[in-house]
């Protein structure tokens, strides 16, 4: 008898395009196995699926090799930030302060 299948989604957003892939995987699959089954790496060859951080519904999963997914889960593949948010805020505040100084 065949294993029961569950439906999940895999999401990834690159700078220039995004993908949301629906895939059927065997019940009891790990997050990493579901990523491989989705073939997201073929659409985005720049992804290192073994090293990139992943999560489910916005919550990062620390051990994707052991985490068992559930029916309806949305697996999200995260990419690194291009700029440090603290540094961006600091630069924006400095620029605003400089603009206020020139206006006075």
UniProtKB/Swiss-Prot annotation:
Name of the protein described by the UniProt record: Protein RnfH
Family statement drawn from the similarity comment of this UniProt entry: Belongs to the UPF0125 (RnfH) family.
Domain of life: Bacteria
Cited NCBIfam families: PRK01777.1 (NF002490)
SUPFAM superfamilies, per database record: MoaD/ThiS (SSF54285)
InterPro entries per the UniProt record, alphabetical: Mopterin_synth/thiamin_S_b, RnfH, RnfH_sf
């Amino acid at each position: 008898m065949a294993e029961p299948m569950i439906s999940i989604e895999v999401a990834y957003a690159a700078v220039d395009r995004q993908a949301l892939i629906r895939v059927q995987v065997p019940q009891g699959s790990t997050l990493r196995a579901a990523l491989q089954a989705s073939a997201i790496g073929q659409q985005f060859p720049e992804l290192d699926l073994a090293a990139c951080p992943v999560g489910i519904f916005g919550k990062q999963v620390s051990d994707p090799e052991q985490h068992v997914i559930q029916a309806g889960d949305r697996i999200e593949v995260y990419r690194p930030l291009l700029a440090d948010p603290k540094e961006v805020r600091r630069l924006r505040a400095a620029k605003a302060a400089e603009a206020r100084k020139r206006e006075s």
